[in-house]
Amino acid sequence: MESRALLAVALWFCVETRAASVGLPGDSLHPPKLSTQKDILTILANTTLQITCRGQRDLDWLWPNTPRDSEERVLVTECGDSIFCKTLTVPRVVGNDTGAYKCFYRDTDVSSIVYVYVQDHRSPFIASVSDEHGIVYITENKNKTVVIPCRGSISNLNVSLCARYPEKRFVPDGNRISWDSEKGFTIPSYMISYAGMVFCEAKINDETYQSIMYIVLVVGYRIYDVVLSPPHEIELSAGEKLVLNCTARTELNVGLDFSWQFPSSKHQHKKIVNRDVKSLPGTVAKMFLSTLTIDSVTKSDQGEYTCTAYSGLMTKKNKTFVRVHTKPFIAFGSGMKSLVEATVGSQVRIPVKYLSYPAPDIKWYRNGRPIESNYTMIVGDELTIMEVSERDAGNYTVILTNPISMEKQSHMVSLVVNVPPQIGEKALISPMDSYQYGTMQTLTCTVYANPPLHHIQWYWQLEEACSYRPSQTNPYTCKEWRHVKDFQGGNKIEVTKNQYALIEGKNKTVSTLVIQAAYVSALYKCEAINKAGRGERVISFHVIRGPEITVQPATQPTERESMSLLCTADRNTFENLTWYKLGSQATSVHMGESLTPVCKNLDALWKLNGTVFSNSTNDILIVAFQNASLQDQGNYVCSAQDKKTKKRHCLVKQLVILERMAPMITGNLENQTTTIGETIEVVCPTSGNPTPLITWFKDNETLVEDSGIVLKDGNRNLTIRRVRKEDGGLYTCQACNVLGCARAETLFIIEGVQEKTNLEVIILVGTAVIAMFFWLLLVILVRTVKRANEGELKTGYLSIVMDPDELPLDERCERLPYDASKWEFPRDRLKLGKPLGRGAFGQVIEADAFGIDKTATCKTVAVKMLKEGATHSEHRALMSELKILIHIGHHLNVVNLLGACTKPGGPLMVIVEFCKFGNLSTYLRGKRNEFVPYKSKGARFRSGKDYVGELSVDLKRRLDSITSSQSSASSGFVEEKSLSDVEEEEASEELYKDFLTLEHLICYSFQVAKGMEFLASRKCIHRDLAARNILLSEKNVVKICDFGLARDIYKDPDYVRKGDPRLPLKWMAPETIFDRIYTIQSGVWSFGVLLWEIFSLGASPYPGVKIDEKFCRRLKEGTRMRAPDYTTPEMYQTMLDCWHEDPNQRPAFSELVEHLGNLLQANAQQDGKDYIVLPMSETLSMEEDSGLSLPTSPVSCMEEEEVCDPKFHYDNTAGISHYLQNSKRKSRPVSVKTFEDIPLEEPEVKVIPDDSQTDSGMVLASEELKTLEDRNKLSPSFGGMMPSKSRESVASEGSNQTSGYQSGYHSDDTDTTVYSSDEAGLLKLVDVAGHVDSGTTLRSSPV
């Protein structure tokens, strides 16, 4: 029992002690107890002050604000007899030690205070460091008091305040003027506002003592406003710098204090700078600025930021919100429309809703062409079209580009412009035309509308039943309209019909109303309706019995032309023919709502003089217009009197005269490209009065109609049938009238080859013979000249180098031979084209080589050469690279040497193979939308599993047969077997039109391994193996290349500056980074990174990881990349094996070739099995050993956390077991620590150019690198490195913009490269492997 009681007591004591130590209350928390019980303690100077404080938890002391050199005199020690006890000791105290001494619990406000007076009669006033350099700020406010901080070391002094100048003394009055030894002298501020300085004075034993002088500054207090800049909500990405400016505007003589409140106020990287801003001349305000800076924000910095300005009497604040994003992003918001409909003439707005940081660059395209703002369109966050027309209809694409990550998002909106029905006759037919009695008449209504019409209807009404108001747009108003089918009381309608016709390039509806006989004057209305609106036309069908009016000439009159109006009447029926012009003021005379006929008001009309001609039956009255003008337009009335009834009959004719207009071509003539034998048709739309005469020219020569050239529609339409090569050229359409001419040009490009005539062949042969003669003569002359080979060789320019273990560095390049008789190629047979890559001192150019290959006349090649001003060392480096390429020899999966131009008389040029599809990284990124991981069922060339089985057996056999024996150096001109032999066995297909499958990725990996195995067999080390240095040729063949001379690595984010050279750190093995060791096995590490690039479809390695010293350390400690999005467990295991920390444990390239070949064969044997994307947990539980099930990508794992785990934890499958059994290496661990397991900070992206660096990202394993310090022994700063961007697309795109080849370069060359028979077999198998799985051929547009 006794032991239990002791145990209980001990437990209670531990609990209480723990509660006190962590700040948790036990029963209660009492203030600390001091050794003195007094609140005020008085001691003499030069004595020792010692106070002990005891409490219930950790204690600490605060004492008066003393100078820094006296802080060493204050001792705080632990008591020996208690846990929570501290003693404060101040030896030899002085007057300035007077003040409050505080003992308190840490992290709480619970404390005990004692005020200590150190009486020193020689220095009764305390000179405290808190006196702010003897300045007292006051405001002229009668209600405000100011405290002069002249505190005393003696509590009962008799103190007065002296002010000067003028001098004045103030003594305490017990009211508003007082002195307190703990605070100082208190006085109303207005009493000393006049003074320049003040001080306190006291008398002790007839001795007068003074405090320090205090300068009096009269200040204001009003704060007008506080403004934050930027004023709106701030968005930043993690790692970026935050700068907030807080500007306060106050009255003059204001002292201001700033304070900031924000989420991470204890941020160690924050910096606050306060300063005055110089006020503008003439202003009565003062400006203060406080700047808050956080160099690298994190997610914890997100929140509300408040700036507070305090002047002593006034406080003002302003706030803003700072939003911190994990990384730059961009996405379209919800609600983006894909279809917008508008009515012609209206204003259209197409807004863009997006979520992005930072604000994106916005580009608009219409039907693939960029749009710029003009007077009809405004582009920006929304597209605004002022008055939309039909021409504006089309597909509008908005492309958003994130300026940091360069990620792009696009959205297409189709704009449909609806056109309400437009009736063409409205502007052409006068509403006052008249029709002869009893005649058959046809009324037409030509309607254009979009979308098509719902219907067209005809209505009619008697003329007397409607009112006429000429001032209105539609002058006729009828209370009701009758359908034409109800013609009771009107004219009989024979038929109505609708037809469709192509008029002026538009599909229009022509509605026709046939009136059997014109007996009754009436109004006819044509009404058309579609979804956009309605249109109508009212026709005045005025029936007369009398004269007829005609216009001569019959064509539409134009100003400054001569024309005549003829009024013809039967001479036996009518007499007194007279012409009148109907003025605007006398168009008609109204009687209420009824219309008085024109003939009843002829006296109000303007009578015209005319000439009368007569024939046997008619009288004709003619009014002639010489040089007609626009003023001659109007309504003309011909009046004739009936001889029997004396009744006048009037006929009205509207005369329209067109304004003269210079010719104009109203549309654009676009260039056209076609092939031989096709038909070209182009329309030249014109306008002008008089009607222009159209003439066509070809290459400035008049074009006339021929058997294949047809001109129609007044020469507007030009058609060329069965085009020939000579039909290509510049075609000009010229439209002329009396006012001038207008021209428009278009270019016809004719592609294809047509058979040449015998004469052409003879000319070509003769020219070739003459050229060959001069070429031989030039060769004889040039061969007599020798060029020097002296100078130092700067091996740092090379990337594919000899193995340093095989030969000393200074001898290995010099001893390599160059056989000019085998490799020299004449410069005059090389036609240089467009540049493919350009660096600091080198460049690669596309060229046509004539006669470099005996199988063709012309072959497209790539030429490596130096830029102007290259040094002798750079010239030697390129020459050494040429020798290395000769030494390496020929291989299908290496960009092979074809020839060189080394003789004097021109630049040094190295000619290599041209790969038309560019580098593999760019190609894979462009094919992400066409990636199909599974096979479609069925075979491509023949159906059933027989073919697949045959292929798989033959595939493995022939892959094994292709060895590095092909490596013997051959001529630069001829090989044993042409690739055309292989093309005869298979159909040639465009590479960019095939879907990308998992089998393609394995095939590419296998080919690169074959190429690296070959380079290793030739004792060569490639020190920049990456997807940007893998080129893609025809038929899915990949080739290892190095365009070190043509890549500007100063601007390439994949190359990080480390010391003197720039290095591709993401691809380098740890031993290369730290020890500058380049071996075949360090190339295996780079091959593993290349596999990651391939199975991520061109992403940049280590996405989101800052490439710095920390990255290198983690890499050396075993942290590796996560599995790429499109890989299999087997391929990821292969990558991990390549990344083994021990170089000797990494697989050899020969082992990788065997393993990847087995995977490729296993892939071909799947016999119709589709690949299914499974969660990793399901994938790893499968017992199949094919190795072809795809894991879920880490992205999808994040979306479905319950189903899969984004980390790879699995045992090696059977598919890789054989590969490991035959290896000397150990298997990788079942789990891998990846960079996703480690929190990452978003780096600030910046590029540091340095012209002093070498041009190549692939540096030699030379003495130059051996001088660099050993990274294992030293730990230098990696500050000179360029951090990678947080978005993988930025780095990957940036790294490939300067690569040797760019995708999209196409060659007209129809010839093929010559390969050995073994390589031709490999080429065939590679191509079949790329196509056998597709079943039905799937194609897409070229990237």
From Swiss-Prot:
Residues 1-19 form the signal peptide. The modification Phosphothreonine is found at residue 1234. It is an enzyme of class 2 (transferase). Residues 1292-1305 have a biased composition (Polar residues). Its EC number is 2.7.10.1. ATP binds at residues 836-844, 864. InterPro entries: Ig-like_dom (IPR007110), Ig-like_dom_sf (IPR036179), Ig-like_fold (IPR013783), Ig_I-set (IPR013098), Ig_sub (IPR003599), Ig_sub2 (IPR003598), Immunoglobulin_dom (IPR013151), Kinase-like_dom_sf (IPR011009). The keyword Zinc does not apply. It comes from the Eukaryota. The chain crosses the membrane at residues 761-781. Belongs to the protein kinase superfamily. Tyr protein kinase family. CSF-1/PDGF receptor subfamily. Tyrosine-protein kinase that acts as a cell-surface receptor for VEGFA, VEGFC and VEGFD. Plays an essential role in the regulation of angiogenesis, vascular development, vascular permeability, and embryonic hematopoiesis. Promotes proliferation, survival, migration and differentiation of endothelial cells. Promotes reorganization of the actin cytoskeleton. Isoforms lacking a transmembrane domain may function as decoy receptors for VEGFA, VEGFC and/or VEGFD. Modulates FLT1 and FLT4 signaling by forming heterodimers. This is Vascular endothelial growth factor receptor 2. The gene is Kdr.
